[in-house]
Amino acid sequence: MLLITRRSGESVRIPESALVAGKVVPAAPARRKGPAASYEELARVAARAWQPVERERLGEWELRAAAGFTRRANSVLPIGDPGVPLDDALSLVRQWYAARELPAYVQTATGAAGTQELLCAELEARGWVREVTAEMWIGALAPIGDLPDPGPDRTVVLAREADEAWLGRYQRKGVSEVALEVLGSGPSVWFATVPGAEPGIPAAIGRCVIDGRWAGFAAVEVDPSLRRQGLATTVMTALARRALSEGASAAWLQVEADNAGARALYARMGFAAHHAYHHYLGPTATDGGTSAGADEHVGRLPGGEIRGGATERYRSV
């Protein structure tokens, strides 16, 4: 069997016996200008880069759960029609999450063509509370890869899995097996580590998921004692070059609206906001959830995310 990856990121299998002819096609030249993208394309790319361990369809909606590890992996992605009236859909959503001892969240978006301003209004009218807002930024990938090398004293190690050192810098406590499964999910996942002065304690880390033309950056975190030294840029440049070598040409990331340092860094790299996205908490979810940040553990189950103070974060989700 041959595994073929389409430009959309979808993988298909073709029996070798069905292949008549083939040739090596080089990667398309990397674009230096910013990409064009629809909300739906970006929403689906972002969802593939941070996959839940459990999912179920409700019409065209997707219900996602991952033992409370981040709202993104424990919320409904409501793209399209749920197939039932909205009140019935929301009731089913609350029941589904209650059965898993999780609060019910719906992830929506605003600010671009095809986003969900009407759904946001309908949720608010029914008592759902907008708990967290962040932004999706996009930009051309090549300019990031074109940034100068940082020098021989800044080695970036790329790996397919997050090792103990990477997890030690990742701003979480008690990362569970479920969390590791979510972190490792995606079409082509890379973890970057800049070794620190002490063995086993990285100076900086990052994560990138390559999916067709897109490279998604996340978990870019720097030791606070080493901030303002370009380490975040170093990490992203190394990951961008890896993504370019796999044929990607566009980049995306997610950042909190009040994270001024991250926004300034990404703007210098050529990123710009595409749309905002929000997590709405259902009115019957009385068991948990936290309003402390955009990427916290939710619900009562152990082994999730608790924001600490050991690193400087360059993205929120």
Give the location of each predicted region.
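Conserved beta-strand-loop-alpha-helix junction that forms the acyl-donor binding cleft
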Residues: 108-115, 224, 253-263, 280-285
